[in-house]
Amino acid sequence: MQRNMLKSKIHRVAVTHCELHYEGSCAIDEDLLEAANIVENERIDIWNINNGERFSTYAIKGERGSGMISLNGSAARRAQLGDLVIIAAFAVVDEAELKAGWKPDLVFVDDNNRIKGSRDHVPTQNWT
């Protein structure tokens, strides 16, 4: 059996640019791409925490160290500057890979979209 699993996530990153007339895509700081194991032209899902919008596009490289998250083309209509978004990518994984300990790459950022930490799992949610 093959499963569609979370492969990469950049959590609560702020939108820095919205370029309506740029060729469609999402430019992401190269440091964030590498940390999250997302490659150029890979399909990504973007979930806007501020307004609930959910959409798909593809990743392109943004200037390294800039903190850039630029929504381009029609995606620019889905967010405003400063909105917090989650960027995710998925992979098809077989049972053997899962049993071998396959894990996602989860990246967490500070208020300037700089990497502050990473994990390979989402903690168990508790009732509190």
Swiss-Prot record:
EC numbers, comma separated: 4.1.1.11
Reactions catalysed, semicolon-separated, are: L-aspartate + H(+) = beta-alanine + CO2
**Keywords, comma-separated and alphabetical:** Autocatalytic cleavage, Cytoplasm, Decarboxylase, Lyase, Pantothenate biosynthesis, Pyruvate, Schiff base, Zymogen
Top-level EC class as recorded in UniProt: lyase
Quote the cellular component terms of the Gene Ontology held in the record.
Answer: cytosol
Please tell me where substrate binds in this chain: T57, G73, S74, A75
- Record text on cofactor binding: Binds 1 pyruvoyl group covalently per subunit.
The residues responsible for catalysis, as annotated, are S25, Y58
Query: Pyruvic acid (Ser) is carried by which residues?
Result: S25
HAMAP family in the record: PanD
Question: Which NCBIfam families does its entry note?
Answer: panD
Which family does the entry's similarity section mention? Answer: Belongs to the PanD family.
Function noted in UniProt: Catalyzes the pyruvoyl-dependent decarboxylation of aspartate to produce beta-alanine.
**Protein name listed in UniProt:** Aspartate 1-decarboxylase
What does the record give as the organism's lineage? Bacteria, Pseudomonadati, Pseudomonadota, Betaproteobacteria, Burkholderiales
Q: Which gene encodes it?
A: panD
